[in-house]
Amino acid sequence: GDPTFCGETCRVIPVCTYSAALGCTCDDRSDGLCKRN
């Protein structure tokens, strides 16, 4: 289904910090939100 928003944004720096440990990556195509597929 759709990627899950991880509650972290990555607009300023395109890197997810704390949610990266949860398997989340920066989806720069959708307002810079960290998402997990």
UniProtKB/Swiss-Prot annotation:
Keywords: Disulfide bond, Knottin, Plant defense. Disulfide bonds join C6-C24, C10-C26, C16-C34. This is a cyclic peptide. Signal peptide: none annotated. InterPro entries: Cyclotide (IPR005535), Cyclotide_sf (IPR036146). Probably participates in a plant defense mechanism. Inhibits the cytopathic effects of the human immunodeficiency virus. There is a cross-link at G1-N37 (Cyclopeptide (Gly-Asn)). The keyword Disulfide bond applies. The lineage of its organism: Eukaryota, Viridiplantae, Streptophyta, Embryophyta, Tracheophyta. One of its GO terms (biological process) is defense response. This is Palicourein.
